[in-house]
């Protein structure tokens, strides 16, 4: 019997306007009545995730958890300090940062465990994309030495052409990404986490902590950085606007897009039939 549904945020649980469709809210409230946990799982920081969910009825997240930084951290809802956290070595982040400076036209986000997000070479278009759901601090120059003793969780490159980001990934010196898990998201991000850290590892860690069989979990997503979670869960569901690579490894592609509210189909196809 399904006990937990984990979902990506952007372009999956949230519509393209970064709002939660009412259909998702109604479906989650019914899921909670049936005893199923709702767990947001995002590449974003915990605080950014909670800000996007601030208008949800409290019952949606009561007693639940949040997987952030692509599995790098797990928080209890309402607690800023993570109960599970991975750390990315400063030297690795600095190496990637220096390469971004060398390239010249690549932007970068650097995420601290405390939830601060530092941006380098950020365009106005990127600021507009992030407006209302992520607060970005702009780096003061071409150095991140001031972050040397700050616990870091992940970083990513920003470029608004995913094909060119894929080309960049293929042509980069392998030493730059040694010891890292990499993925792509939102049509604009090339993401870096410590090896073994992804949304799938985060879901497995949370399920184990809660004593839930991974087969009794459902994951929802739309893009490459969701694929490990889609494969780890008992059922992997993608929205109709999912990328082809995510669709290919999913168990079920919903008719609903992120703007419609995919949780209605999750509820009707997988959860309610077990309670009849």
Model regions: which residues?
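Active-site phosphate-binding/coordination module
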Residues: 22-125
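Conserved acidic, metal-coordinating active-site core of Asp-based
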Residues: 99-220
